[in-house]
């Protein structure tokens, strides 16, 4: 078996990626989230496939088909809630994964980092089109509001919106194409994830100390496969608790009402994992400005490798930037809270302050703290 896995053309790739891969001996549990994301993707594709067997992408029957899945299909309720809450687990793992990358300076591996940003954007797009499919009130109005933002693009905006809608409003054509996108995008994510791994294994993994670990590597299997399995079991435990005991805790009550174009919900808001970006969008009174801020809130992650001037790798020995980092995380939580609040004082003001803080920390405060710490080292 040993000879086969080292010589077989296909098994050799698996062997070099998951078995004999030289890995730093000191990577902590924060490095588990890559494998957890892979697990989440597998769960989402499998549950999604079974849901697609019973779902109909037609405005007249979409809502009923979801109710049919929950009521009449064997364990349909479980598959549906695993899929819905699996998306939340996916984004929790994603945000922790990105946060770990920022904290430990993984962005210096720029190819891996940039593919990761593409993965984040693609996952957000997949989740958005998926949220439209149950065709509840929040699905319909969320789709209307978010797609309508494209009309802010000069010259081609209105044409682009009608092209995406497939008509003059969100209707059957929109639902059908969103279902098609939602079906194909996870497989594109899987392909990008392989490219992400390919680039990571070109350079080798980062480690908590931020020091070169070439002299202290251990094989991935059995050490980290066992460690990853523990993480996967814990993830599945949390997911099952969510799906079985609190299936609707992260959903919106408005989505239990079928879509009605004549009745607007009091507060239109996306799923919790988009609230931080939604708060940034709403904090700018100008439509085009809001859309640009929304896009930049994610794309700004690409500036981390460019703005990094620190002589040290990661934040483990950098107390000044550590403080700024945790302020940044707290600020993100504030943005998430504000995104779910109505558009009125004092929430709008708090949202504007938090949005300015978000960009200021990344563009100004972190580079300044890098310079301060570099000068402290010279003393």
UniProtKB/Swiss-Prot annotation:
Pfam families: Cytochrom_B_C (PF00032), Cytochrome_B (PF00033). It is a multi-pass membrane protein. The gene is MT-CYB. The keyword Ion transport does not apply. This is Cytochrome b. GO terms for molecular function: metal ion binding; ubiquinol-cytochrome-c reductase activity. It comes from Akodon mystax (Caparao grass mouse). InterPro entries: Cyt_b/b6_C, Cyt_b/b6_C_sf, Cyt_b/b6_N, Cytb/b6-like_sf, Cytochrome_b, Cytochrome_b_C_euk/bac, Cytochrome_b_N_euk/bac, Di-haem_cyt_TM. Signal peptide: none annotated. Binds 2 heme b groups non-covalently.
């Amino acid at each position: 078996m040993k000879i086969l896995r080292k010589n077989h053309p296909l098994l050799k790739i698996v062997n070099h990626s998951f078995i004999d891969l030289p890995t730093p001996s000191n990577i902590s549990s924060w490095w588990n989230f890559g494998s957890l994301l892979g697990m989440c993707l597998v769960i989402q594709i499998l549950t999604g496939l079974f849901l697609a067997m019973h779902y109909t992408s037609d405005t007249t029957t979409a809502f009923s088909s979801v109710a049919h899945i929950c009521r009449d299909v064997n364990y349909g309720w479980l598959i549906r809630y695993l899929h819905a809450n699996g998306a939340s687990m996916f984004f929790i793992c994603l945000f922790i994964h990105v946060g770990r990358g920022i904290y430990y300076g993984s962005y210096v591996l720029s190819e891996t980092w940039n593919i990761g940003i593409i993965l984040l954007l693609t996952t957000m797009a997949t989740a958005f089109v998926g949220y439209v499919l149950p065709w509840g009130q929040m699905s319909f109005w969320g789709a209307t509001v978010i797609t309508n933002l494209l009309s802010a693009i000069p010259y081609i905006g209105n044409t682009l919106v009608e092209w995406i809608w497939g008509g003059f409003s969100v209707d059957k054509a929109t639902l059908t194409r969103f279902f098609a996108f939602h079906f194909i995008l996870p497989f594109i994510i899987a392909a990008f994830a392989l490219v992400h791994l390919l680039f990571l294994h070109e350079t080798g993994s980062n480690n908590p100390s931020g020091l070169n670990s070439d002299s202290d590597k251990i094989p991935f299997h059995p050490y980290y496969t066992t460690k990853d399995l523990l993480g996967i079991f814990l993830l599945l435990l949390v997911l099952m608790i969510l799906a079985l005991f609190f299936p609707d805790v992260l959903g919106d009550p408005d989505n239990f009402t079928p879509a009605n174009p004549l009745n607007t919900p009091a507060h239109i808001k996306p799923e919790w994992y988009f609230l931080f970006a939604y708060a940034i969008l709403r904090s700018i009174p100008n439509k085009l400005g809001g859309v640009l801020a929304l896009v930049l809130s994610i794309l700004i992650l690409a500036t981390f490798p460019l703005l990094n001037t620190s002589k040290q790798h990661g934040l483990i020995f950098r107390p000044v930037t550590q403080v700024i980092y945790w302020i940044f995380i707290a600020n993100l939580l504030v943005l998430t809270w504000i995104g779910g609040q109505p558009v009125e004082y004092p929430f709008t003001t708090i949202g504007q302050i938090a949005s300015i803080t978000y960009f200021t920390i990344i563009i100004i405060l972190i580079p300044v703290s890098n310079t301060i710490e570099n000068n402290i080292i010279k003393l």
